[in-house]
Regions:
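Sec-dependent N-terminal signal peptides
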Residues: 4-14
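Generic hydrophobic alpha-helical segments
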Residues: 11, 53-54, 143
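Cleaved targeting-peptide boundary
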Residues: 18-26
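Domain-scale activation on soluble regions of proteins
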Residues: 25-31, 116
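Short N-proximal segments of mature Sec-exported proteins
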Residues: 34-89
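Compact alpha-helical subdomains of small soluble proteins
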Residues: 76-153
Length: 153
């Protein structure tokens, strides 16, 4: 039991202290659909970005915030499945870790977007975050298309 708690402590320490946002520019749609690790990374980042946008705009633009929230929640279970596969752990275990990772990344995105907003009067202008959002939009569109095709078979 002590060993298990120690491993969890080490994992959370790495997650909370060592994480910085890197642009998603090195990822491709092909990688997303063919590489489980890339898929997990992209899902985690896109869900976090959508969640950060939801938090930042929910007062001024509640309908738009609701749309971003729905997109994040649609992708969320697939992120957990992907995390479970890449870490070879149960869905329940993956869900706990994934939630923590997404929460931490969401906070990093919020901080970055606020800094950029103060500097450029825009959350996205002159920042990699706008490029990440465009990439996440393409991923989400493609992902939804694949899911709807699988459901129609």
């Amino acid at each position: 039991m002590k060993k298990y708690i120690f491993i969890i402590f080490i994992f959370f320490s790495e997650v909370t202290h060592g994480q910085t946002l890197q642009p998603l520019e090195n990822n491709t749609l092909e990688d997303f659909f063919t590489d489980e690790k890339a898929s997990h990374t992209v899902l985690e980042r896109c869900i976090s970005l959508y969640s950060a946008i939801t938090e930042l705009i929910k007062i001024k633009h509640p309908e738009l915030a609701s749309e971003f929230y729905q997109i994040a929640n649609t992708l969320y279970p697939y992120g957990i499945i992907s995390f479970s596969k890449t870490r070879n752990i149960s869905y329940e275990e993956a869900e706990k870790f994934f939630f923590t990772n997404v929460n931490n990344l969401t906070n990093l995105y919020i901080d970055e977007m606020k800094k950029n907003g103060e500097k450029n009067k825009s959350y996205f202008k002159m920042s990699f975050i706008g490029d990440d959002l465009r990439f996440c939009h393409e991923v989400t569109k493609s992902f939804n298309l694949v899911i709807s095709e699988l459901n129609s078979e």
